[in-house]
Amino acid sequence: HLEQEGCRTRVTVVPPGFDFQELYVDSRNSLPPSVLSWLASRRGCPVIAQVGMLRPEKGHEFMLNLLFHLKMNGRQFCWLIVGSGSPELREHLQYQIDSMGMHDDVFIADNVFPAAPVYRVASLVVLPSENESFGMVLAEASAFSVPVVATQIGGIPEVIQNNQTGTLLPAGNKHAWMCALNDFFNDPGRFYQMARLAKQDIEERFDINKTVLKILTLAKHK
């Protein structure tokens, strides 16, 4: 596409970098008391975390419907939603949660900054977005060896290798997502094995020092 537009210069893509040491230090911060209290009341249940702004394209309603069906099938879990958005959207989502009788299973924590402590308590991180340019949440979760399940769209496949370092699924495909979530409940060990590989991969490819070095090298040879 760039060549068609007349660009003849070689283009090099440098991925964003993460200061993993700072991320690990941030994870030692305490979660808000409201989150800790809710988690204590749900002790023993797997914590499914979704981190990101409350926007229609982030798939919160899609995820809620999936988890409702899982609950009807006897699955026990707690879904921790981390992220802020418009008051109207939050109110609508909370209304749906209450209407489905999911108020004990779902907690909207609003903005938690830094978000790193969330990964210390998460059993699984989900990202059912319809549109995602990169998926930094997946890289952060992987740094803590937390299994991830996400949509195979946008820049997400640049972060997660399907069935190797995580699970990628078609956006909006209820059957595929239900199967993947049931697989996690039935065989979490397989997902944690991928998560351990993801940690190694993410720290190798997205370390901030390597990113800076690549940029400096490109600038030097420009």
Language-model segment annotations:
Residues 24-41:
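A short helix/loop element that forms part of the nucleotide-sugar donor recognition site in Leloir-type
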Residues 111, 130:
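Aromatic "clamp/platform" in nucleotide-sugar-dependent glycosyltransferases that forms part
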Residues 92-110:
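Nucleotide-activated donor-binding/catalytic signature segment of Leloir-type glycosyltransferases, i.e.
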Residues 1-13, 18-22:
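A short, active-site helix/loop in glycosyltransferases that binds the activated sugar's phosphate group
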Residues 46, 176, 183, 190-205, ...:
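A short, well-ordered alpha-helix in the C-terminal region of glycosyltransferases
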Residues 162-163, 167-174, 183-189:
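Conserved acidic donor-binding segment of nucleotide-sugar-dependent glycosyltransferases
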Residues 147-150, 160:
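Short hydrophobic beta-strand element within catalytic cores of glycosyltransferases
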Residues 46, 50-69, 91-92, 167, ...:
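A conserved mid-protein helix/loop that constitutes part of the nucleotide-sugar donor-binding site
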